[in-house]
Structures are given as C-alpha cells and as structure tokens.
C-alpha cells in the first residue's frame, strides 16, 4: 500500500486512498480541519474558511458507511471541498460576506451544492469574500483571506477577486477543491495568485441557481482546483441540466436563447484527451498584456517577472505545436474605448445608452430581491427589509475604493426596493441590452477570431499583484488599483460578453514568490475545446508551486494499511467537550472525550496532536496555550476565533468516527 500525502493530494489520490483502505472520509475531514485550525484560524491566520459545516463528520461517516456497503454514490463520494460564502448550503448561513446577512440562513442547497451532496462529496465550510462579492480584497463581515505564498501580497486582485477565500483554501490544501464565483475577475484573479486552475463557463454552462447574485448578466460559478484533471472530475458532477430556472438569470430571461448544459458537455470530461490538443492551434496574444501596446490611453504596466514567465509560456506553447501570434485586441479596446478610434457598444448602437444604468440598478435590485424571496427566511424576507447601512460598511482606517463612476453605496438598493421592485419583463432596455451583448461578442471577438484564423487567445492572467496593505496605504493602493492589477486582465469583458476562459498556472515570479496564471479564452459554447488546450499546456508544464507558508503537518501523511478485515455496522458514538479557563498570560483547555466502544483515539488542538489519559471509554487531558491564541483579530464585526479541538476514533473492528468542538472564542 502507498502512503497518502494530504498536501497537494488530487481527487484521484484521495479516492484511491479511500478505496484501498488507507484512509476514511472521516479521517480526511479531520486532517483538513486540523490544517484549517493550524494555518487558517491561528498561526499565520490565513482566514480563508470562516464558516465551518457542523455536520461535516456526520456526512463523512455516512460516506464511509456507503463505501463499506458497496453503495458509493460516484467518484467524489467522501471527497472534502469548500464553497464560497455566497453559495446556499441548507441550514448554513449565506451572508455573502456582508454584515447585513450574517444570520441569513439558507433554506436549500444551491444547484452545485446539491449536485455534490448527491454525489457524496463532503462540505468542510464556506470561504471568505468581501460584502456581496462587490470587490476583491475589501474586508467583509469575516475579514478577508491572506496569501499562503507571501504575506506581503494579496491573495487576489483588490478590485475584483472576491473568491479570495476559495483561492487561498484550495492552494493551502484546506480541501481538495473549492467553488468560487466571478462577475468581473473574482474567480480568475485568486486562481492566478494561488497557482490554481479556474474555469469561467459560457452562459448557462453551470447553473448558478442558489448563489447570491451581484450583476446577473455577468455572474458565473467558478470551480477552483489545483490541476486540470481535478477540474474535469468536478465538472462531470456539476455540469448538468437544471430543471429549475429561478435564480439563474440567463436561463430565466426569455430573449436570448442559450444551449442546455447537456448540449455543451461531453459524455465524460475526465475522459477528454488532453495530450496533443495544442498541436496545430493558432493562438493570439494581445499585445496590450505583454508590454507591447502602443496608443492606449491607460496602458497596462506588466511586471518584468510576469513578462519573463510569459516568454517561457510562449516557448512552451510553441514546443507543444501551437503557433503564437501577437495581436491587437478590439474586443477590449472597443469595450473600454481605451484609444483613439475605439467605439463602444453604445457608440455603435449595439446596446441602448440606458442599458448600463438599468443593468446595475433595476436588474440587480430585482435579482437580489428575488434571491431573498426565494430563500424565504422570515427574518429577511425581501430586499426592502434589509438594513442597507450594513450591506457594505467600511472598516475603520480603510481607504476609499477607486471605482470612479462605477462606485456607489449598495444601501441605495434597499431604498429603491422600498419604492417598489420592477419585474424583469418591465425593466426598460433589458431585452435590447442582452441582445446587444451577444452581438458585440460575435462582432468584436468571434468574427475577429475568424478573420485572424485564431483558435483562441492566450494571455498572462494579471499584470502584477497588489501589496497586502493596499487597503490602508496610499502608495500600495496606487499599485493595486493600476490597470492590469486592479482586476485580472480582460477586466469586465469576458463576463459581460459571455466569453469562456480557463486559467492555469504559468509559473511563480522570481522576485516576489507570487504565482501568475495563464488565461485561455475562446468562442462562446466551445468550452470543451478550450478546456483541452488549457489542459494540454498544464499537463506538459506543471508550473504550479506549493505554498511555502502552509507545509505538511505531522499527521498529514496516511500510511497504507489496507481495508479492515472485519468492519462493524453500528454507528461509533463519541462525545467531545472542551472548556477554556483564563489564567494570566495563558489559557488552559480541558478536554473530555467519551466513546461508546473501545477505540484508538487521536486528538488535536489547533492542528497539534495532544495526549489524553484514558480510563475505560473516557479520555481526558489539558492543554496550555498562550492567551493570545484567543485574542486574534480578523474582523471588526466579530469576536476572536476559538481553538478547534478535533477527535478521530477508530474501533478494533475498523469503524471510524470523528467530532470537533470550538472553545475560547467563536467557531
């Protein structure tokens, strides 16, 4: 039997360990939770997973029982994952990072969560984000996530990287994959800064039902994985037709016909051939992203170490049989009118002049209100009942954002909702606007691809990475808000026009040790071809680097042991308690564990193993920690995190049970 190393383990690695008896799902959940306790809640305090699923061990134990009985639900049964705080998971809060919704409880699972639950995957917890995903690295009700690569730099783009917790958690091996989202670049930016794979699908490619909306025309589900094969395994589960449309804008609106998910996907994503996919492909790299743009009003300043990585990537692509050509990029130039002669969608009459205002106000207000009404939490039944001042408050000392004309107070949504929410069909300019977005994509991107004989475009995902103190330091903010750094390259264009992208690791910058991604973008609804060419590059280059700040813990390696010869069927009962007593500069944690059967016991406090004294089926012990352990700051709206105590017990007949508790602070 081979040993299983948790850090960087793939879905296939974990599944193999589950199948051959090296590990159980309960033990996987315990190990990931210990990493969260050690690196996320305490220690370097990455703060990526602020909400834990209290039922994680029960879900894992149910998976282990199915496996013993030969009734597994599929390839992801027992596999732990995280989801962004904007995904509904029944019974958990769905705050979307906002103090206004800190106690909003999800009445059902989002589509993707439901698909994963039905496949047996185990939700560890919900990941951090700024309020309502309306930004990137602004601090929300749970604070923000930090970088596992370099504490001095941001884990996502400051202005658009709201899936920052998902990026950090997946990179740091707090789970094997994460579910993020994107409206501008909130999935791509954290993927780039964390050496991850991210997929932003064509419109309707993955149902977004049950996800908090931001701007419905742009919002998409974005899976985060460490490899393309992991992404493909995940897509096999979450890409499916959704019979319900409410809450998934592009399938609700009646004016633009989009394909069903089943029409876009292959029989098996995991079986897609990747090797050789780049051979013979002609790829365009926009000059604006590789330091060769001339004539732009606001040129992109790309860091020298990013350009070094790009030059290597270009050589790699050519070695894999692709032709790489430098091109102008009218789809971005026209959209942003960034140079003389560029003409926007409105300039050309493709989109009504009032569409932008109707989209950001009427449409978003309608979608937020509809989300709350569908969720049916009596405490917050609709948008008009929300405390608007709490939606996106500024923490003390934070610099003002620099969105310019796009900046406004989200509290105004509530005030407008109190005057009445217009039904979707009654919002002026929406039909013409949606059709105009589709026409713009065809004219400025797909027709342009055809005219230049291009199969796709490829580009560095970002021009630079912002400093970690960009929220409080003016000089750092100047860099973090610079074009190419404030939002991942492409800015709003990909999502607004419905252009699919796949981002994979391009390498790690030699000067600052931060990763950078390589983004591939292609024709709408040609997602499978895009996945294969990105997968071919990732397969051949393996440019992902392991975060140096989150190494393996002592118990992150599971030794091959084979399946137990006899496995009991009865539930393995255990009761875990912990109490904290303050004594000057230290806190004493008293732990008690009772098991219903004789068992081997492993207990950890904040990821560190502790010894307990046993008497029959009762085990007790005490741990001393610095009082500062329970005084850490992560949010002005919450108290300090407590210590996480985990217990894994294994009975002589092979049954494994787990439990956790939190003491000395919030959970």
Positions of PLM-derived features:
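Sec-exported extracytoplasmic/periplasmic mature domains
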Residues: 19-20, 33-45, 61-68, 117-118, ...
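An N-terminal boundary/leader segment
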Residues: 1-59, 65-69, 91, 309-322, ...
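A short helix-breaking turn/cap at a secondary-structure junction
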Residues: 72, 200-308, 541-577, 585, ...
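Short, well-ordered beta-strand elements
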Residues: 223, 504, 514-523, 531
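Short helix-loop capping/hinge segments that flank enzyme active sites or metal/cofactor-binding pockets
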Residues: 2, 76-99, 277-295, 344-446, ...
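An extended, acidic, His-containing surface patch that forms the Zn2+-binding/catalytic region
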Residues: 421-443, 451-496
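Short glycine/serine-rich loop/turn segments
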Residues: 42, 73-219, 249-254, 286-288, ...
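Gly/Ser-rich, acidic/histidine-flanked active-site/gating loops
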Residues: 7, 87, 93, 248-378, ...
